[in-house]
Amino acid sequence: MNVLMISDVYFPRVNGVSTSIETFRKELSRRGASVTLVAPDYGGHGEEEDIIRIPSKKVMFDPEDRMMSYGAILEQKEELRNRQFDLVHIQTPFVAHYAGVALAKELGLPKIVTYHTFFEEYLYHYIPFLPASWMRALARRFSRTQCNDVDGIVVPSHAMAKTLEQYGIQKPLHLIPTGIPEAMFESGERMAFRDKYGIAHDTPMMLFVGRVAFEKNIEFLLHATDLARRQIPELLLVIAGEGPALRSIEKLACTLRLEKNVRMIGYLDREKGLKDCYSAADLFVFASRTETQGLVLLEAMAAGVPVISTAHMGTKDILKEESGAVVPQDDIGEFAAAIVHMISEVEKRSERALQAHRYARSWSSGAMADKMRNLYKNMKEGSSTGASITVR
Protein backbone atom coordinates (compact mmCIF):
# COMPACT_ATOMS: atom_id res chain seq x y z
CA MET A 1 0.00 0.00 0.00
CA ASN A 2 1.49 3.33 -1.11
CA VAL A 3 -0.23 6.42 0.29
CA LEU A 4 0.21 10.13 -0.40
CA MET A 5 -0.79 12.27 2.59
CA ILE A 6 -1.03 16.04 2.32
CA SER A 7 -1.49 18.50 5.17
CA ASP A 8 -1.35 22.24 5.87
CA VAL A 9 0.28 21.48 9.25
CA TYR A 10 2.94 19.14 10.58
CA PHE A 11 5.76 19.24 13.09
CA PRO A 12 7.43 21.43 14.26
CA ARG A 13 3.91 22.90 14.44
CA VAL A 14 2.45 21.20 17.50
CA ASN A 15 -1.24 20.29 17.47
CA GLY A 16 -3.55 17.29 17.32
CA VAL A 17 -3.38 17.05 13.53
CA SER A 18 0.42 16.78 13.57
CA THR A 19 0.24 14.15 16.30
CA SER A 20 -2.39 12.15 14.43
CA ILE A 21 -0.41 12.19 11.19
CA GLU A 22 2.80 11.13 12.93
CA THR A 23 1.05 8.34 14.83
CA PHE A 24 -0.62 6.88 11.75
CA ARG A 25 2.51 7.20 9.60
CA LYS A 26 4.57 5.23 12.12
CA GLU A 27 1.96 2.53 12.69
CA LEU A 28 1.15 2.13 8.99
CA SER A 29 4.86 1.82 8.22
CA ARG A 30 5.11 -1.01 10.76
CA ARG A 31 2.32 -2.72 8.81
CA GLY A 32 4.15 -2.55 5.51
CA ALA A 33 2.48 0.55 4.10
CA SER A 34 4.51 3.37 2.60
CA VAL A 35 3.30 6.89 3.48
CA THR A 36 4.73 10.01 1.85
CA LEU A 37 3.70 13.33 3.41
CA VAL A 38 3.47 16.70 1.67
CA ALA A 39 3.63 19.45 4.32
CA PRO A 40 4.71 23.09 4.82
CA ASP A 41 8.32 24.13 5.11
CA TYR A 42 8.74 25.94 8.44
CA GLY A 43 12.49 26.36 7.96
CA GLY A 44 15.38 24.61 9.65
CA HIS A 45 14.40 21.06 8.72
CA GLY A 46 17.02 18.36 8.54
CA GLU A 47 16.84 15.27 6.40
CA GLU A 48 13.33 13.79 6.63
CA GLU A 49 12.40 10.45 5.16
CA ASP A 50 9.30 10.43 2.96
CA ILE A 51 8.38 14.06 3.71
CA ILE A 52 8.20 16.64 0.92
CA ARG A 53 8.41 20.16 2.36
CA ILE A 54 6.70 22.88 0.33
CA PRO A 55 7.72 26.59 0.33
CA SER A 56 5.28 28.40 2.62
CA LYS A 57 4.43 31.80 4.06
CA LYS A 58 3.30 32.76 7.55
CA VAL A 59 -0.44 33.11 8.06
CA MET A 60 -1.29 36.68 9.07
CA PHE A 61 -3.85 35.92 11.80
CA ASP A 62 -1.94 32.94 13.22
CA PRO A 63 1.87 33.16 12.88
CA GLU A 64 2.33 29.58 14.11
CA ASP A 65 0.82 28.33 10.85
CA ARG A 66 2.05 28.40 7.26
CA MET A 67 0.31 28.64 3.89
CA MET A 68 1.87 26.36 1.30
CA SER A 69 2.40 27.46 -2.28
CA TYR A 70 -0.29 25.75 -4.36
CA GLY A 71 1.84 26.02 -7.48
CA ALA A 72 4.86 24.49 -5.76
CA ILE A 73 2.77 21.48 -4.77
CA LEU A 74 1.56 20.91 -8.31
CA GLU A 75 5.14 21.18 -9.55
CA GLN A 76 5.74 17.90 -7.72
CA LYS A 77 3.15 16.16 -9.93
CA GLU A 78 5.51 14.18 -12.16
CA GLU A 79 7.71 13.11 -9.27
CA LEU A 80 4.62 11.96 -7.40
CA ARG A 81 3.32 10.15 -10.48
CA ASN A 82 6.56 8.17 -10.62
CA ARG A 83 6.03 6.98 -7.04
CA GLN A 84 2.86 5.15 -8.11
CA PHE A 85 0.61 5.96 -5.17
CA ASP A 86 -2.59 4.04 -4.48
CA LEU A 87 -4.59 6.93 -3.01
CA VAL A 88 -4.43 10.48 -1.64
CA HIS A 89 -5.28 11.14 2.01
CA ILE A 90 -6.00 14.84 2.70
CA GLN A 91 -5.59 15.95 6.32
CA THR A 92 -6.59 19.63 6.35
CA PRO A 93 -9.06 21.89 4.49
CA PHE A 94 -6.93 24.74 3.20
CA VAL A 95 -4.32 24.66 0.41
CA ALA A 96 -3.75 20.96 1.13
CA HIS A 97 -7.36 20.11 0.32
CA TYR A 98 -7.48 21.82 -3.07
CA ALA A 99 -4.02 20.64 -4.07
CA GLY A 100 -4.80 17.12 -2.87
CA VAL A 101 -8.02 16.97 -4.89
CA ALA A 102 -6.20 18.31 -7.97
CA LEU A 103 -3.37 15.78 -7.61
CA ALA A 104 -5.80 12.90 -7.14
CA LYS A 105 -7.63 13.85 -10.33
CA GLU A 106 -4.38 14.29 -12.29
CA LEU A 107 -3.02 10.95 -11.06
CA GLY A 108 -6.33 9.09 -11.31
CA LEU A 109 -6.40 8.16 -7.62
CA PRO A 110 -9.15 7.84 -5.01
CA LYS A 111 -9.10 10.58 -2.38
CA ILE A 112 -10.19 10.66 1.24
CA VAL A 113 -10.06 13.34 3.92
CA THR A 114 -9.83 13.24 7.70
CA TYR A 115 -12.11 15.82 9.33
CA HIS A 116 -9.90 16.82 12.26
CA THR A 117 -11.29 20.23 13.24
CA PHE A 118 -14.80 21.38 14.19
CA PHE A 119 -14.65 24.58 12.13
CA GLU A 120 -18.19 25.63 13.02
CA GLU A 121 -16.94 26.43 16.54
CA TYR A 122 -13.48 27.53 15.43
CA LEU A 123 -13.51 30.15 12.70
CA TYR A 124 -15.32 32.94 14.53
CA HIS A 125 -12.63 33.02 17.23
CA TYR A 126 -10.13 34.11 14.57
CA ILE A 127 -12.35 36.44 12.56
CA PRO A 128 -14.15 38.18 15.45
CA PHE A 129 -15.21 41.24 13.44
CA LEU A 130 -17.88 39.14 11.64
CA PRO A 131 -21.00 37.79 13.41
CA ALA A 132 -20.52 34.30 14.86
CA SER A 133 -23.72 33.10 13.16
CA TRP A 134 -22.31 34.10 9.77
CA MET A 135 -19.05 32.30 10.42
CA ARG A 136 -20.85 29.13 11.55
CA ALA A 137 -22.99 29.12 8.41
CA LEU A 138 -19.89 29.71 6.27
CA ALA A 139 -18.04 26.86 8.00
CA ARG A 140 -20.94 24.46 7.39
CA ARG A 141 -21.16 25.36 3.69
CA PHE A 142 -17.38 25.17 3.35
CA SER A 143 -17.25 21.71 4.97
CA ARG A 144 -20.20 20.38 2.97
CA THR A 145 -18.64 21.41 -0.34
CA GLN A 146 -15.22 19.98 0.48
CA CYS A 147 -16.44 16.69 1.94
CA ASN A 148 -18.76 16.01 -0.98
CA ASP A 149 -15.78 16.52 -3.32
CA VAL A 150 -13.89 13.43 -2.06
CA ASP A 151 -14.58 9.69 -2.04
CA GLY A 152 -14.78 9.22 1.72
CA ILE A 153 -14.36 11.01 5.04
CA VAL A 154 -12.55 9.74 8.13
CA VAL A 155 -14.01 11.10 11.37
CA PRO A 156 -12.49 10.65 14.84
CA SER A 157 -15.75 10.50 16.83
CA HIS A 158 -19.46 9.67 16.66
CA ALA A 159 -20.34 13.30 17.40
CA MET A 160 -18.36 14.53 14.41
CA ALA A 161 -19.97 11.94 12.16
CA LYS A 162 -23.43 13.03 13.29
CA THR A 163 -22.55 16.69 12.71
CA LEU A 164 -21.37 16.02 9.15
CA GLU A 165 -24.53 14.06 8.41
CA GLN A 166 -26.53 17.08 9.58
CA TYR A 167 -24.51 19.25 7.18
CA GLY A 168 -25.91 17.17 4.32
CA ILE A 169 -22.70 15.33 3.45
CA GLN A 170 -23.48 12.34 1.24
CA LYS A 171 -20.12 10.58 1.03
CA PRO A 172 -19.28 7.55 3.25
CA LEU A 173 -18.14 8.34 6.80
CA HIS A 174 -15.50 6.09 8.36
CA LEU A 175 -15.02 6.28 12.13
CA ILE A 176 -11.31 5.86 12.88
CA PRO A 177 -9.96 7.77 15.91
CA THR A 178 -6.27 8.39 16.45
CA GLY A 179 -4.90 5.81 18.86
CA ILE A 180 -2.31 5.98 21.62
CA PRO A 181 1.24 4.75 20.83
CA GLU A 182 2.66 2.11 23.14
CA ALA A 183 5.39 4.52 24.27
CA MET A 184 2.80 6.75 25.94
CA PHE A 185 2.06 3.96 28.44
CA GLU A 186 5.62 4.08 29.76
CA SER A 187 6.13 5.96 33.02
CA GLY A 188 7.85 9.32 32.95
CA GLU A 189 10.00 10.87 35.66
CA ARG A 190 7.58 12.63 38.01
CA MET A 191 10.07 14.14 40.42
CA ALA A 192 12.57 15.12 37.73
CA PHE A 193 9.89 17.24 36.06
CA ARG A 194 8.86 18.87 39.33
CA ASP A 195 12.47 19.60 40.23
CA LYS A 196 13.13 21.12 36.80
CA TYR A 197 10.22 23.55 37.13
CA GLY A 198 10.61 24.26 40.84
CA ILE A 199 7.39 22.51 41.85
CA ALA A 200 7.44 21.02 45.34
CA HIS A 201 7.01 17.26 45.44
CA ASP A 202 3.84 17.52 47.53
CA THR A 203 2.16 20.35 45.58
CA PRO A 204 -1.23 19.24 44.19
CA MET A 205 -0.68 19.72 40.46
CA MET A 206 -3.33 19.86 37.73
CA LEU A 207 -2.34 19.75 34.08
CA PHE A 208 -3.70 21.01 30.77
CA VAL A 209 -1.88 19.98 27.59
CA GLY A 210 -2.78 21.50 24.25
CA ARG A 211 -2.74 24.53 22.05
CA VAL A 212 -3.40 27.72 23.99
CA ALA A 213 -6.23 28.81 21.74
CA PHE A 214 -9.54 30.55 22.36
CA GLU A 215 -11.61 27.51 21.37
CA LYS A 216 -9.91 25.39 24.08
CA ASN A 217 -11.90 27.20 26.81
CA ILE A 218 -8.86 27.53 29.08
CA GLU A 219 -10.39 30.56 30.80
CA PHE A 220 -12.97 28.13 32.25
CA LEU A 221 -10.12 26.18 33.87
CA LEU A 222 -8.66 29.37 35.34
CA HIS A 223 -11.97 30.35 36.92
CA ALA A 224 -12.36 26.81 38.31
CA THR A 225 -8.83 26.99 39.71
CA ASP A 226 -9.67 30.31 41.33
CA LEU A 227 -12.62 28.71 43.15
CA ALA A 228 -10.80 25.49 44.08
CA ARG A 229 -7.75 27.26 45.57
CA ARG A 230 -9.98 28.79 48.24
CA GLN A 231 -10.03 25.33 49.80
CA ILE A 232 -6.63 24.19 48.52
CA PRO A 233 -4.43 27.34 48.53
CA GLU A 234 -1.34 25.55 47.19
CA LEU A 235 -3.19 24.14 44.15
CA LEU A 236 -1.23 24.56 40.89
CA LEU A 237 -2.46 24.46 37.29
CA VAL A 238 0.30 23.79 34.75
CA ILE A 239 -0.50 24.73 31.14
CA ALA A 240 1.75 22.97 28.62
CA GLY A 241 1.33 24.59 25.22
CA GLU A 242 1.46 27.80 23.24
CA GLY A 243 -0.89 29.60 20.89
CA PRO A 244 -2.80 32.75 19.95
CA ALA A 245 -4.69 33.00 23.27
CA LEU A 246 -1.53 32.97 25.39
CA ARG A 247 -1.54 36.69 26.22
CA SER A 248 -5.25 36.63 26.98
CA ILE A 249 -4.83 33.70 29.38
CA GLU A 250 -1.85 35.34 31.08
CA LYS A 251 -3.85 38.54 31.52
CA LEU A 252 -6.80 36.66 33.03
CA ALA A 253 -4.48 34.83 35.42
CA CYS A 254 -3.17 38.19 36.62
CA THR A 255 -6.69 39.62 36.94
CA LEU A 256 -7.71 36.64 39.10
CA ARG A 257 -4.43 36.92 41.04
CA LEU A 258 -3.46 33.40 40.12
CA GLU A 259 0.23 34.11 39.63
CA LYS A 260 1.15 31.48 42.25
CA ASN A 261 -1.47 29.00 41.07
CA VAL A 262 -0.91 28.93 37.30
CA ARG A 263 2.31 28.06 35.45
CA MET A 264 2.71 28.39 31.67
CA ILE A 265 5.54 26.16 30.44
CA GLY A 266 5.12 26.17 26.64
CA TYR A 267 5.41 23.19 24.31
CA LEU A 268 7.27 20.08 25.44
CA ASP A 269 9.18 17.41 23.56
CA ARG A 270 6.79 14.48 23.04
CA GLU A 271 9.43 11.79 23.43
CA LYS A 272 10.57 12.83 26.90
CA GLY A 273 9.35 16.15 28.28
CA LEU A 274 5.64 15.53 27.76
CA LYS A 275 5.82 12.05 29.27
CA ASP A 276 7.49 13.43 32.40
CA CYS A 277 4.92 16.22 32.56
CA TYR A 278 2.00 13.80 32.54
CA SER A 279 3.67 11.68 35.23
CA ALA A 280 4.16 14.76 37.41
CA ALA A 281 0.44 15.61 37.40
CA ASP A 282 -2.13 14.57 39.99
CA LEU A 283 -5.05 15.52 37.74
CA PHE A 284 -5.64 16.30 34.08
CA VAL A 285 -8.26 19.00 33.48
CA PHE A 286 -10.00 19.82 30.20
CA ALA A 287 -12.99 21.92 29.12
CA SER A 288 -12.74 22.37 25.34
CA ARG A 289 -16.06 22.53 23.51
CA THR A 290 -14.71 21.98 19.99
CA GLU A 291 -12.69 18.75 20.05
CA THR A 292 -13.34 16.26 17.27
CA GLN A 293 -11.67 13.66 19.48
CA GLY A 294 -9.65 14.96 22.45
CA LEU A 295 -6.48 12.91 22.10
CA VAL A 296 -4.78 14.50 25.12
CA LEU A 297 -7.42 12.92 27.37
CA LEU A 298 -6.25 9.49 26.25
CA GLU A 299 -2.60 10.49 26.63
CA ALA A 300 -3.24 11.50 30.23
CA MET A 301 -5.13 8.27 30.92
CA ALA A 302 -2.32 6.22 29.36
CA ALA A 303 0.07 7.91 31.79
CA GLY A 304 -2.21 6.94 34.68
CA VAL A 305 -3.47 10.46 35.36
CA PRO A 306 -7.13 10.73 36.41
CA VAL A 307 -9.19 13.13 34.30
CA ILE A 308 -11.74 15.81 35.11
CA SER A 309 -13.37 17.08 31.93
CA THR A 310 -16.57 18.48 30.56
CA ALA A 311 -18.02 16.39 27.72
CA HIS A 312 -18.54 18.08 24.36
CA MET A 313 -18.38 16.80 20.78
CA GLY A 314 -15.66 14.17 20.33
CA THR A 315 -14.68 13.95 23.99
CA LYS A 316 -17.98 12.16 24.67
CA ASP A 317 -16.58 9.08 22.91
CA ILE A 318 -13.66 8.98 25.34
CA LEU A 319 -15.30 10.04 28.60
CA LYS A 320 -17.13 6.78 29.23
CA GLU A 321 -17.87 5.54 32.75
CA GLU A 322 -15.22 2.84 32.41
CA SER A 323 -12.55 5.52 31.76
CA GLY A 324 -12.57 6.57 35.41
CA ALA A 325 -12.98 10.19 34.34
CA VAL A 326 -15.04 12.62 36.39
CA VAL A 327 -17.40 14.47 34.05
CA PRO A 328 -19.05 17.45 35.75
CA GLN A 329 -21.63 19.66 34.09
CA ASP A 330 -20.43 22.68 32.16
CA ASP A 331 -20.45 24.71 35.37
CA ILE A 332 -17.42 26.35 36.97
CA GLY A 333 -18.62 25.72 40.52
CA GLU A 334 -19.28 22.03 39.91
CA PHE A 335 -15.95 21.64 38.11
CA ALA A 336 -14.10 23.29 41.00
CA ALA A 337 -15.88 21.04 43.50
CA ALA A 338 -14.75 17.99 41.49
CA ILE A 339 -11.16 19.24 41.64
CA VAL A 340 -11.28 19.70 45.42
CA HIS A 341 -12.85 16.27 45.93
CA MET A 342 -10.33 14.48 43.70
CA ILE A 343 -7.30 16.19 45.23
CA SER A 344 -8.55 15.50 48.76
CA GLU A 345 -9.44 11.82 48.22
CA VAL A 346 -6.02 10.29 47.56
CA GLU A 347 -7.21 6.67 47.58
CA LYS A 348 -10.05 7.33 45.13
CA ARG A 349 -7.68 9.27 42.91
CA SER A 350 -5.32 6.28 42.78
CA GLU A 351 -8.21 3.96 41.89
CA ARG A 352 -9.29 6.24 39.05
CA ALA A 353 -5.70 6.48 37.81
CA LEU A 354 -5.49 2.68 37.47
CA GLN A 355 -8.90 2.58 35.82
CA ALA A 356 -7.85 5.26 33.32
CA HIS A 357 -4.63 3.43 32.45
CA ARG A 358 -6.49 0.17 31.76
CA TYR A 359 -9.12 1.98 29.69
CA ALA A 360 -6.56 3.75 27.50
CA ARG A 361 -5.19 0.36 26.42
CA SER A 362 -8.35 -0.20 24.38
CA TRP A 363 -7.42 2.80 22.21
CA SER A 364 -4.09 1.50 20.90
CA SER A 365 -2.64 3.19 17.84
CA GLY A 366 -1.95 -0.20 16.29
CA ALA A 367 -5.62 -1.18 16.29
CA MET A 368 -6.62 2.14 14.73
CA ALA A 369 -3.90 1.82 12.07
CA ASP A 370 -5.31 -1.59 11.15
CA LYS A 371 -8.69 0.06 10.55
CA MET A 372 -7.07 2.77 8.43
CA ARG A 373 -5.10 0.27 6.36
CA ASN A 374 -8.27 -1.72 5.73
CA LEU A 375 -10.02 1.45 4.57
CA TYR A 376 -7.12 2.24 2.21
CA LYS A 377 -7.37 -1.28 0.77
CA ASN A 378 -11.11 -0.91 0.19
CA MET A 379 -10.68 2.51 -1.43
CA LYS A 380 -7.95 1.19 -3.72
CA GLU A 381 -10.25 -1.63 -4.81
CA GLY A 382 -13.09 0.81 -5.45
CA SER A 383 -15.19 -0.28 -2.48
CA SER A 384 -16.78 1.86 0.24
CA THR A 385 -17.26 -1.07 2.62
CA GLY A 386 -16.22 -0.50 6.19
CA ALA A 387 -18.12 2.77 6.33
CA SER A 388 -20.13 1.88 9.41
CA ILE A 389 -20.02 4.32 12.30
CA THR A 390 -18.58 1.90 14.85
CA VAL A 391 -15.34 2.37 16.79
CA ARG A 392 -14.93 -1.19 18.02
For each predicted feature, which ranges?
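A conserved mid-protein helix/loop that constitutes part of the nucleotide-sugar donor-binding site
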Residues: 19, 204-230, 237, 244-250, ...
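Donor nucleotide-sugar binding/catalytic pocket of nucleotide-sugar-dependent glycosyltransferases
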Residues: 39, 52-53, 136-189
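A short helix/loop element that forms part of the nucleotide-sugar donor recognition site in Leloir-type
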Residues: 186-199
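Nucleotide-activated donor-binding/catalytic signature segment of Leloir-type glycosyltransferases, i.e.
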Residues: 247-268
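Short alpha-helical donor nucleotide-sugar binding micro-motif in glycosyltransferases
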Residues: 267, 276-281
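Short hydrophobic beta-strand element within catalytic cores of glycosyltransferases
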Residues: 306-309
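Conserved acidic donor-binding segment of nucleotide-sugar-dependent glycosyltransferases
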Residues: 320-321, 325-332, 341-347
